[in-house]
């Protein structure tokens, strides 16, 4: 999390989770963030983890969020790349969707509009 405390995702079962891996230098990451925030605000049944893949820096990340109009997404880091290794990630942005039982059910490598009708229709199948 923002304080570099480990977050146990196994304790989050029961909710759909989106693990969104991003970096401030990644243009597609910047473009998709507003729709990710909108999804997080309007879909309480989905827990969103926006994970900054850069060197952990709370102030810089807050400034980045502010520069693109993000006001309510929590900040997470993966400084030891544990999640990157666990999910065998390649490239940014990457979004991993996890069902209520803790199993990955989809992965998007590249930019996505999280609030599009197509995405909404898809993810509702897993509520």
Each predicted region: which residue ranges?
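Hydrophobic beta-strand anchors of alpha/beta hydrolase catalytic cores
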Residues: 18-19, 48, 95
């Amino acid at each position: 999390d923002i304080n570099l405390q480990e977050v146990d995702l196994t304790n989050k079962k029961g909710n759909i989770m989106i693990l969104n891996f991003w970096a401030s230098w990644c243009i597609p990451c910047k473009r998709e963030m507003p729709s990710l925030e909108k999804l997080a605000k309007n879909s309480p049944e989905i827990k969103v983890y926006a994970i900054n893949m850069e060197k952990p820096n709370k102030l810089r990340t807050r400034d980045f969020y502010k520069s693109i109009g993000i006001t309510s997404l929590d900040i997470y880091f993966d400084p030891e790349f544990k999640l990157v290794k666990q999910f065998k990630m390649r490239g940014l942005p990457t979004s991993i969707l996890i069902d209520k039982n803790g199993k990955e059910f989809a992965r998007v490598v590249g930019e996505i509009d999280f609030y599009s009708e197509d995405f909404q229709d898809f993810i509702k199948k897993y509520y």
